[in-house]
Every structure is written in structure tokens, then in C-alpha cells.
């Protein structure tokens, strides 16, 4: 791998790390404007759960910013765990929506809205993992 493509990869990773640095902004966004953006998949939209989720993300952001040992690995592990929850959500949420269609249409509409709202957070985690794993493989 030449130096120019390696530098470009590091620049993309630095850009992806800003997601962690801006965790308080994402928490406010999810709390007031976009419920279910990212933490809602894991916490079900609970405000305290969201606060805990974004506290972990902010802590990872601080660790990455200060170049703490294992910060990048911890961020990778956090995103892998998040994607495990996402996989469960992707597989079972449509079944829950289908089962709720018969009785309660208000709840069904809310579940559909939450499903759509969480897609950008899922996509971000997938992109993050691809770049981090690609970097780990290229360094070895």
C-alpha cells in the first residue's frame, strides 16, 4: 500500500472519529429531534439508557482524542456490539411490526417510524467497522 492511499485512509478514520467527539450533540439530537437515531436500537428509546449509551461514546471519543492505549480497539468493539444489537433489531423488528398490525395501529406506526429513524446510525456503524478493520488488516 503506498503512502498516499494510507494517508487517505487515516484521514477517513479521523473523520469517522468525529462521530465519537460529537456524542453530546447526538444525544441532544436523539432526545429532542430524532428519536431512535442510534441509541434507540439498544435502549428502546429510554432517556437514561440513551444518556448512558452516549456517555460511553463520549468516553471513547475522549480516549481516541487523547490517543489512549486500546481506544481504537475499544471503539471497534463497541461498534461490533452495537451491530449485534442492530442485527437483532433488523431481524425481529419487522416481525414485531407485523404482529402488532392487527390490533394497535398507533403502536405499529410508531414502530415503523423508529425502524426508519435508526437506519442512518446503523449505516454509520457499518462504515466505521469497514474502515477500522481495513486499517487493522493493512497494518499487519
Regions found by a protein language model. Give the residues of each.
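Topology signature of small-to-medium multi-pass alpha-helical membrane proteins
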Residues: 2-140
Amino acid at each position: 500500500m503506498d503512502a498516499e492511499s494510507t494517508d487517505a485512509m487515516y484521514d477517513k478514520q479521523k473523520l469517522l472519529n468525529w462521530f465519537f467527539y460529537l456524542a453530546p450533540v447526538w444525544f441532544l439530537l436523539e432526545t429532542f429531534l430524532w428519536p431512535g437515531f442510534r441509541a434507540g436500537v439498544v435502549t428502546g428509546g429510554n432517556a437514561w439508557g440513551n444518556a448512558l449509551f452516549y456517555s460511553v461514546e463520549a468516553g471513547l471519543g475522549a480516549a481516541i482524542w487523547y490517543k489512549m492505549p486500546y481506544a481504537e480497539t475499544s471503539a471497534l468493539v463497541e461498534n461490533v456490539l452495537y451491530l449485534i444489537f442492530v442485527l437483532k433489531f433488523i431481524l425481529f423488528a419487522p416481525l414485531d411490526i407485523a404482529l402488532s398490525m392487527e390490533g394497535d395501529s398507533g403502536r405499529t406506526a410508531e414502530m415503523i417510524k423508529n425502524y426508519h429513524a435508526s437506519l442512518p446510525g446503523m449505516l454509520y456503524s457499518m462504515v466505521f467497522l469497514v474502515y477500522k478493520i481495513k486499517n487493522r488488516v493493512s497494518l499487519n
